[in-house]
């Protein structure tokens, strides 16, 4: 059969990235405490395309992914990227896994156990077989306004906030290490299951540790800069203000060039 994709491009523009998006794929990922966690990822895959080809071979992306049967980490992702480059005969390749990562969390007072999910993304891109890894995660937390607490006779405004972390990694690190690092930098973590005694504890503990978004982003950055295998990072904290119709945010970037 005639292979139309392999004919020369009619317009002489090379394509930076072409491929498939939104592939659902079951994965395993190593946890610190409970071994392998099974979850479902959304996978994006892409390669560059020269002017010598009108189109890429879309089915080959799916073939490569179907043949890949390893727990997700930087080392296995590197092998997948290189195999994609080889199969698609490309100079550059990009693969990203978007997935929910689950932790068992105990309520602070009753010790009741429940699952809590975090949105994560592990991606890799290659340029002439040099590989760069990026781990991204979103950690929801609670923040209490220090100013509101200082000027009010009773209470202070509090709200749910989100911490967005992007990390340039030299090698894979346990995701929960970064989750704990982020949660400990805010006024309080969040929980799926809280009884009344737990609600009392969380409220009082959060009000004992008021934080601006500026405090949270600085706390996290000061910890990340000491972590081995983290080559650079971006951290943004966004607070969904309970007394305003707008949000507050703070952002720090350190040696994050990609």
Curated annotation (Swiss-Prot):
Calcium found in the keyword field: no
UniProt record similarity statement: Belongs to the GTP cyclohydrolase IV family.
Looking at the record's lineage, which domain of life comes first?
Bacteria
Q: What does this protein do?
A: Converts GTP to 7,8-dihydroneopterin triphosphate.
> InterPro entries recorded for this chain?
GTP_cyclohydrolase_FolE2, GTP_cyclohydrolase_FolE2/MptA
Looking up NCBIfam families in the UniProt record yields: PRK13674.1-1 (NF010200)
Offer one example of a GO biological process linked to this entry. Answer: tetrahydrofolate biosynthetic process
Q: Which residues fall in a coiled-coil region?
A: none
Q: What is its EC number?
A: 3.5.4.16
Q: What is this protein called?
A: GTP cyclohydrolase FolE2
Per the UniProt record, the site (May be catalytically important) maps to 145
Its pathway is: Cofactor biosynthesis; 7,8-dihydroneopterin triphosphate biosynthesis; 7,8-dihydroneopterin triphosphate from GTP: step 1/1
Q: What class of enzyme is it?
A: hydrolase
- Organism equals Lawsonia intracellularis (strain PHE/MN1-00)
Q: Give the UniProt keywords, A-Z.
A: Hydrolase
Q: Which reaction does it catalyse?
A: GTP + H2O = 7,8-dihydroneopterin 3'-triphosphate + formate + H(+)
User: GO terms for molecular function, please?
Assistant: GTP cyclohydrolase I activity
